[in-house]
């Protein structure tokens, strides 16, 4: 297992992060995503940590708090050293039907960090993330609250998820102007079949030296190699069959799978491992979040950390999955040619 620095911090996190969305199986969409209970959760956490993973990501809304509870109990039952683990969770989503049961107000963030700490049975959260954009709460309020949580010791670092490039830059500017704790990481959807992140957000991540945590790297299982057509529901119990998320161009995805399959067959490994290895080959990626419904899935995903694609394979996959030109990107590239090389005169 390799480790990478999280943004501009001095904190090393494993290049694979254990996702916990499959823990709990509450009603609704959560049951279709995963229904792992305590014994299975303990087994997954132990296997991941033994494999070198030191980074675990959860959220208050996952199975409406049950994911955090199961994870917290696993850490205690397994007797894991707290200082050796980086635990991340999130807040923003709706936790109840009260007027202030969602969002990023000081009121909600304070209540939710305390609730998460209680469920996790922890004294502090390593990385506390806003789980999206709240159009009603000014960044000034949210960041001041998060800054206070950092100063109190309940939170050590702060991150964000699923924001547009302009929103990320605005948040960083507010922190700079008011001398508040800054977001150190971005959690975002990125796969070989869905590279939209590269248009704007990746540029911000690189320019501002933020960490990138990739969620749903297999597009909800679509890139596992177990689906054969856009209408295919996959094997029994497949998440895509019941919960068709996240959004992906399925024809584009199958084109990528067709390119990855020979690489997997030559190595006698799964297509999923090739898809994960491609993401890990990108220098702007800090960690890839892997969530599994079974131990077989977890073992297979973790094995991707040992897969090294060669330059020719990466080039082929980059070309197959290349984004179509879009303005202003193509204009910037065209105009940039004039500054690509230093001037020279015989």
What positions do the PLM features span?
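Conserved, mostly hydrophobic/aromatic
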Residues: 6, 18, 56, 71, ...
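Short, well-ordered coil/turn segments that N-cap beta-strands
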Residues: 11-16, 52-54, 80-85, 122-126, ...
